[in-house]
Amino acid sequence: MVKSTVPTRPNKYWPGVVAIGLVSLFIFLSVSNQKHSTTSGDNIHKFSNGGTYRDGSKCITYNRNSPLAYNGSSSNNTLFWLCLLGLSMVWIAYCGYKSLSGQWHSCQHDKNERNFLFECFE
């Protein structure tokens, strides 16, 4: 017996989207959580973030690093950017899935329309 329907091609975008997301997350976290490359102290005592040491003959006080140095993890925008990255990855995967499954011809839009971002969901 001859099949009358053509099988659909499986969605192969999700591994790429996941890989790009993980690499982006790794790069973002490695840039946003930089450690200071120098440590303060002497040849015996190391204070990477400042500190105080006192013994019988020596008293050392090194200043703490600023919590805002390198625009690090003290930024309040970190969660916002991670959520935005995740939502954009879901958007790309969803549009790719819908176009491959034949539910849309493509996510094209008329440039004169105002709501072209939501055309994919109609």
Curated annotation (Swiss-Prot):
Transmembrane region(s): 13-33, 77-97
UniProt key word Transmembrane: yes
**What are the entry keywords?**
Host cell junction, Host cytoplasm, Host cytoskeleton, Host endoplasmic reticulum, Host membrane, Membrane, Transmembrane, Transmembrane helix, Transport, Viral movement protein
Q: How does it sit in the membrane?
A: Multi-pass membrane protein
* Superkingdom to which the source organism belongs: Viruses
Cytoplasmic face: residue ranges?
1-12, 98-122
User: What does UniProt give as GO cellular component?
Assistant: host cell endoplasmic reticulum membrane; host cell plasmodesma; host cytoskeleton; membrane
Q: What main location does UniProt list?
A: host cell
Q: Does the keyword Acetylation apply?
A: no
Its function, per the record, reads:
Participates in the transport of viral genome to neighboring plant cells directly through plasmodesmata, without any budding. TGBp2 and TGBp3 are necessary for intracellular delivery of TGBp1-containing vRNPs to plasmodesmata. Can gate plasmodesmata and increase their size exclusion limit. To a lesser extent than TGB3, induces host actin cytoskeleton network thickening, which probably plays a major role in virus cell-to-cell movement.
Q: Which family does it belong to?
A: Belongs to the virgaviridae/benyvirus TGB2 movement protein family.
Q: What is this protein called?
A: Movement protein TGB2
The species this protein belongs to is: Peanut clump virus (isolate 87/TGTA2)
